[in-house]
Amino acid sequence: MRAPLATTRIVLSEVTKSYDTRVVLDRVSCTVRPGERVGVVGDNGSGKSTLLRLLAGRERPDHGEVAVTAPGGVGHLAQTLDLPPTARVGDAVDLALADLRALERRIRAAESRLHRAEPEDLLAYGDLLAAYEARGGHDAERRVAATLRRLGERAELDPDRRLGTLSGGGRSRLALAATLAAEPELLLLDEPTNDLDDEAVAWLEEHLLAHRGTVVAVTHDRLFLDRVTTTVLEVDHDRRTVRRYGNGYAGYRTGRAAERARREREYEQWREEVRDAERLADTNIGRFAAIPRKLPRGFSGAGAFRARSRTHGAASRIRAARERLARLTAHPVPPPPRPLVFTGRFTDGSDGAGAGAGAEMRSVEVADVALPGRLAPLSLTLAPGERLLVTGPNGVGKSTLLHLLAGELEPARGGVRTPPRVGLLRQDDPWQREPRSVVEVFGQEYADLVAGHGLLAPADLVRPVRALSAGQRRKLELAHLVARPLDLLLLDEPTNHLAPAVVEELEAALAHFGGTLVLVTHDRRLRAAFPGRRLELQREPAAASR
């Protein structure tokens, strides 16, 4: 086994990065220590991929400095391959092994000069060979093929195959396998668990835990963060800054909770100070009113002096209280975002599941339903308040089932009965072309709800919806569901495009949702903790298990 590498140095100093007029990162300073495994989290569009490209040297900051030292090489996995469909598989492998290919060329060049080499040339040649051996350069291509198999790719590696003939998942797995096979000291990975099944993700986690160098990975996968990372960097979309949390994902969750508690304390302290200032002003106004304004003619002496002193003192206290109140109201402490809570009113007027006059009308019945080519014959009954997790391979009909339950599709045979109030969170994005703002589309009351939950910054409420990131539009859809009383909630990949902190809130909100829930998700942590029934859809007739 080759010796561990612990020489990586990553330092960002006052880094600012903009695209056109939009500032993505603003005066960001942070450090990554040698050997750390860093998870980068944040809202979609917050600048996580930008941060990785800056570290990889693919982009330059507008201001500030990015210093990356990794003598053992840098491997950068982007979310998409930067090659045309006509490029070959071998081109993608060469791109990922570029450091090794460069080492090979330097070794060949040094070998061509060995017959007239000076002692220092021989030393340099030895260093090149040592670096090449440390990276396992001799069998890198074999490792690409072996890694591809561990990532779930069954087809043999054909270097002459066109990239355009691979699926999107196939291209992602190829890029990841080649990046890992290069064995660089520093791994920069952008959503490495995308397009991997559970077995492949488990292998990837073990591989990264055994990695000899430093890892910086952008990911939404909470279980991956929990198992792999030692440090979390959160890219704040609103503040355009980066905050560091130690002790892995557990430390991130603890730090977020502590930050929320601090914000609640500061907000309550500000409210108490406002109340105190108002009370002080009101009290002194009352005292001031009780002081005689005119003294009897000829009245003088100590009594007159005390009266004038009381008048002056009360006026001063009123003025001071009003000035303090003005300062407090001019610089208000914003309240912490309200947690997500689904509305708990149901069709029969109850606040949850169970028997009652409306229980039957709140149940779900799927009787021998089928859609040829999209969904195999299926029968299903859900009582009010039941929870169902729908699983199965891609293309088996999970989303189709949700659209049937939402009344957006008609079955070719059989029947579907659902409660009157049904909410569906779609996997696709219905708002990506909407030119109007959030306020214009949904109204001010809804916009206030979104802002109150901390789902969007106030400035984003007046931007065109299509200009928002996919994650921001996803949160719009979530807020729409939160605001409505629902009997049946249908969630199709609800964690897509959402930062882990928002997913944690969604998970807590679902735990208190009293209606019927049907969930489709690839989120391993959400699946593992799911408390209800499970239905695995198959190509053949399926039945729900208890």
Labelled PLM ranges:
Residues 261-297, 311-319:
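ABC ATPase nucleotide-binding domains
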Residues 296, 312, 323, 335, ...:
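Proline- and threonine-rich low-complexity intrinsically disordered cytosolic regions
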Residues 100-111, 128, 270, 274-288, ...:
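Non-transmembrane amphipathic alpha-helical segments
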Residues 131-134, 306-313, 317:
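An accessory alpha-helical subdomain
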Residues 1-265, 345-546:
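ABC ATP-binding cassette signature C-motif
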Residues 314-329, 333:
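Interdomain "pre-motor" coupling segment immediately N-terminal to P-loop NTPase/helicase cores
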Residues 122-130, 298-308:
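A short, surface-exposed helix-loop junction/capping segment
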Residues 117, 140, 289-294, 327-338:
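Proline-centered turn/helix-capping motifs that create local helix->coil transitions or kinks
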